[in-house]
A protein has these predicted regions:
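C-terminal helical cap
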Residues: 53, 371-374, 380, 386, ...
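C-terminal cap of metal-dependent C-N hydrolases
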Residues: 464-525
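Metal-associated gating/positioning segment near the N- to mid-region
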Residues: 93-167, 186-192, 246-254, 275-276
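Histidine-rich, glycine-flanked metal-binding segment
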Residues: 30-36, 40-44, 55, 61-110
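Divalent metal-dependent hydrolysis catalytic cores, especially in the metallo-beta-lactamase
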Residues: 132-153, 170-181, 202-216, 235-238, ...
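Bacterial N-terminal signal peptides
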Residues: 9-19
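Active-site gating/metal-coordination segments in enzymes
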Residues: 178-233, 252, 261, 289-306
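Active-site neighborhoods of metal-dependent hydrolases
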Residues: 200-211, 268-430, 528-531, 536-540
Length: 540
């Protein structure tokens, strides 16, 4: 795809969701996931027993083991302690009659991860769904929230149902659509149209909404109607409160109207302003120049109220009272504070498609490719930005607020799956204990997705009666989150004095179906190799 055609697609999406053009334009989408092959995943089994594991249950409780976990079909039916640490296991007390066993002695088992900001590829990036799904599953992501559903409402709903039936190798999908996407009645320019669209989307079967854009949706009366109708119909809501609308509606104002969660940081520092009402934009600022947009974003948090100030505490107190959820997506902006690190991440060579790599390159026409002349000062500003942003997120968690994990990969040198794990590392950098990181990645993500429906958890913790979405890891992820990367972690073997790779998820289990995580990564590597050979052939 040419840069021009990439830009046309992106502009179409942005204009569509912001109400600048009527949404009757043709929806473009990527190739859906292929049907699951006979050799892709084993099970579900009548009685699968995972034996001898150390369990991290996702609630924040410490590890415990050894345990045997019994799964029947797609549900956990029993978690049984079978001994004591560093002591022999007595077989007499172990569950029996397995139709399939996994020996997880010395390994760790966790709930499947929830990526609360996970786009299923994009036409501009040239990423087929299979590529994206397998990268997620290889990194333990068994559930995603698709914020925006820009492949089209019907497309995402079809993929959601195919995943629910395990017809494809994919995480379970929660479809959040953007206001106005998919219908033929124009932009949401009145409260009545906003309510009508919510009812239309509910009838289609969506799970919730991601509010994004710069059009009338930010008008307080339209936002209020939209969010009120969404809550009335038990639909979720989140937002990317972009700069073009945040002067009218910051995060706190939206939360008061019923918004349930937020993405990134947009609208939060603006809610913390105590000596200004708009960001200190340079007078030659142009939002459509992404070097301006992201360069100045890195100078935003220092314009907000200081940590511990009355304004800081007042905003945090009210968001906590409203039971508001923060989904920070630290990872997607990380290149802004260290461009070279993001560009040279070791997984790019083997696992990044050539089309995606081209999309990442500096360009005024591709979203998130704003490295026109990125400077040392830009990176310093972003490092300082992160310190304040992370301070708010960590304190919000410490005071009882829910913080979830989302990656927003597919932009800014961030790769699906790999950079979900990087998000976990960045939460630890912000001050989270690794058990708090795992809780955000599992139970809290599940709570965010279940709460609007008023239903109890179906996944997100390891507990009898819940869905069998599990991860089995050979190494201790609490000691080093890097062992969750598909490339593993580097360690010097003191017995051999040789450097070795350790870790990488061994098995990802979704709905009781056991997937070999390394095989999923090998499938991705073959896709990348084939794309590179095709590109080389075209150049000859």
């Amino acid at each position: 795809m040419s840069r021009l055609s990439c830009r046309v697609w992106l502009l179409g999406a942005v204009c569509f969701i912001s109400g600048l053009v009527a949404p009757a334009q043709t929806q473009r989408s990527i190739e859906p996931g292929p049907n699951r092959g006979a050799n892709e995943g084993e099970g579900p089994f009548a009685r699968l027993i995972i034996r001898g594991a150390t369990m991290i249950d996702g609630t924040g409780a410490p590890p415990v083991g050894p345990v045997d976990i019994v799964v029947e079909n797609n549900r956990i039916v029993e978690v049984r302690s079978v001994g004591f640490a560093k002591s022999p296991i007595r077989d007499a007390n172990r569950p029996k009659n397995a139709t399939r066993e996994i020996d997880a002695t010395g390994m760790y088992v966790l709930p499947g991860f929830v990526d609360c900001h996970a786009h299923i590829g994009g036409v501009a990036q040239g990423t087929p769904a299979e590529y994206v799904y397998k990268l997620w599953m290889a990194h333990g992501v068994t559930t995603i929230r698709e914020p925006g559903s820009f492949n089209g409402v019907d497309w995402v709903l079809r993929e959601r149902e195919r995943s629910a039936k395990n017809e494809i190798v994919a995480p379970r999908i929660f479809a959040y659509v953007s206001p106005g996407l998919g219908w033929d009645k124009g932009a949401l320019r009145t409260p009545e149209l906003a309510r009508e669209y919510v009812r239309w989307a509910k009838e289609k079967g969506v799970d919730g909404f991601k509010i994004i854009g710069d059009g009338p949706i930010y008008d307080p009366e339209i936002m209020a109607a939209f969010l009120d109708e969404a809550r009335r119909l038990n639909l979720g809501s989140t937002t990317h409160l972009a700069q073009m609308g945040v002067a009218r509606m910051n995060v706190l104002q939206a939360a008061r109207l019923g918004l349930r969660s937020m993405e990134h940081w947009y609208g939060l520092p603006e809610a913390l302003f105590d000596n200004r009402t708009v960001q200190d934009y340079p007078l030659d600022y142009n939002y459509s120049d992404e070097s301006h947009r992201f360069g100045q974003a890195g100078r935003l948090w220092k314009q907000a109220a200081l940590p511990g100030s009355k304004k800081w505490n007042d905003v945090m107190d009210e968001l906590l009272k409203l039971e508001f959820t923060l989904d920070p997506t630290f990872t997607i902006y990380e290149a802004s504070r260290d461009l070279t690190r993001a560009m040279r991440a070791e997984w790019h060579d083997r696992y990044t498609l050539p089309s995606l790599w081209r999309f990442y390159q500096p360009s005024r026409e591709a979203h998130g490719s704003y490295w026109f002349y990125w400077t040392t000062q830009d990176e310093i500003e972003w490092k300082n930005n992160y310190r304040l942003w992370m301070a708010f997120i960590n304190e919000y968690k410490n005071r009882g607020g829910r913080v979830t994990t989302g990656s927003d990969s597919g932009f800014i040198y961030k790769l699906y799956g790999f950079d979900y794990i990087r998000e976990l590392e960045l939460l630890q950098e912000a001050g989270f204990h690794p058990l708090e990181v795992v809780r955000s990645a599992t139970m809290y993500g599940a709570q965010l997705l279940h709460a609007p429906k008023g239903k109890p958890l179906e996944f997100g913790i390891i507990r009898p009666g819940l869905l069998a979405d599990l991860i089995i890891v050979p190494e201790n992820p609490l000691a080093n989150l890097k062992v969750l990367y598909g490339t593993g972690a580097i360690r010097l073997n003191d017995q051999t004095n040789q450097v070795e790779r350790v870790g990488g998820i061994k098995y990802t289990i979704k709905d009781g179906i056991v997937y070999d995580a390394r095989k999923l990564l090998a499938d991705v590597e073959r896709m990348v190799d084939a794309a590179k050979k095709k590109q080389q052939g075209a150049g000859n």
